[in-house]
């Protein structure tokens, strides 16, 4: 009887303890995820700003969490869409990864564990537990998935070749080590950097258009003939943009970079001494180091951080990283401090030229503000600020992605369902910006890429066709001005694509003659009119040798199922009315 009473008392005690445990929650604080930067679980926002830097999906990430009792063992369970992905045991604070260059530890109080990339998805939730307690559920603010394709297309100019400069094996691709480090610096899910199908551009001359610094057009044969340090680079950017457009890559997550390899008047390699970037294209030297990552930043739409700070559009003083979150490199398994490492060249006398934090330590500059060279030993690149990663993260958010596994061949991110969904291309704004979202009508076929320049004021050597390229590429839709049935669709204001010629007219036609005697006509969505005046007056700039309007550049692809024998560019004013051989003016003609 006494034994029974004692047993009942013991069971009652255990029940009370269990009830107390069941009614309490494991307390967790300061939950962070580290991939490109170390971010709070809700992401990072800025005062008086509507943007948020979100945690990256499909990227292995370091989870950090702080608990009241650091001596206990903790686990974390991860769900995605309420499906359990798995359970992991966190490492205690002593096992937190180190800081670059043996710098100050990021934390001495955080448990941590790497979360597999397949678990890092929107609609993710996590729960921590010990043997007796469980935490509430936490919901990381996961962003959209961006998989970047980067085309590398070297320009060998003025006699530069593999022997007197650098071979294509160096200029036309980046190593896996470089690619692996780049992805650690960019808020992307993946990076695919490849040599462009064209492979390389080899030209003995370059046409500089009129208008830059109020100068006339010029044909040059060495880099010393440029009239300012960025003139050649500016032309290269225009060509890259044209090739990107000719392949229908404008709506997609595609960047271009052109290593610029050219010879000077002495016949020797001439360093470009800088770079230029913007609008998803960039150019610079061939080394794929500081200039490359800086110009890639411009390609994403990032300005110089110092100028942006002065205009109130960058939160950290003078383009520095003072206030930015630390970075983290999964490949090196170490934190990246915002302070300049003490064992690199930039550290010496840095207090004379760099921003100092409250402890008088020198603070790194952003990659977009002279930050090249601030990286620790063993790294190729320094850091972007967390604030700049928002621009990188959002740059391709509205991209239309080609994916054969979707019924239409395209997908687009849905910000409501937080996943990619089937997208059906359509023509917006009555065709003002092209047909079917500016996407190709054929992909990955043999094409010729044709690049034409013309000057309306001369000299004659500015009007020419560069050597054509044959490669794999995409084809864009064109209307045939000799086909009245097709022209019905682009009559201004009254047709299916009523604004197709409203940007600045449709005043030029390409004629391709093939070796078999057949011909092809293509009306260009380009003209000599002002905005929204497809039949309006022609501007005066076309006869001004110092105006950019007096120079014309046309870049397009044609299918390489037949061999062209002649390519011609005609001025066909009001081309939406048709091609009239008696009134058409031949601008450029070249036989092959």
Swiss-Prot record:
Active site: 295
UniProt keywords, alphabetically: Hydrolase, Metal-binding, Metalloprotease, Protease, Secreted, Signal, Zinc
First and last residue of the signal peptide: 1-19
Entry GO terms, CC: extracellular region
A single MF term (Gene Ontology): metal ion binding
PROSITE patterns: PEPTIDASE_M66
Residue ranges occupied by any Peptidase M66 domain in the UniProt entry: 140-402
Protein's cellular compartments: Secreted
Cofactor binding mode and count: Binds 1 zinc ion per subunit.
Known EC number: 3.4.24.-
Biological processes annotated in GO: proteolysis
Cofactor(s) it depends on: Zn(2+)
InterPro entries: Dictomallein, Peptidase_M66_dom
Keyword Secreted found: yes
Pfam families according to UniProt: Peptidase_M66
Residue sites binding Zn(2+) per the record: 294, 298, 304
The family this protein is said to belong to: Belongs to the dictomallein family.
Name by which UniProt lists this protein: Dictomallein-1
Gene that this polypeptide is encoded by: dtmlA
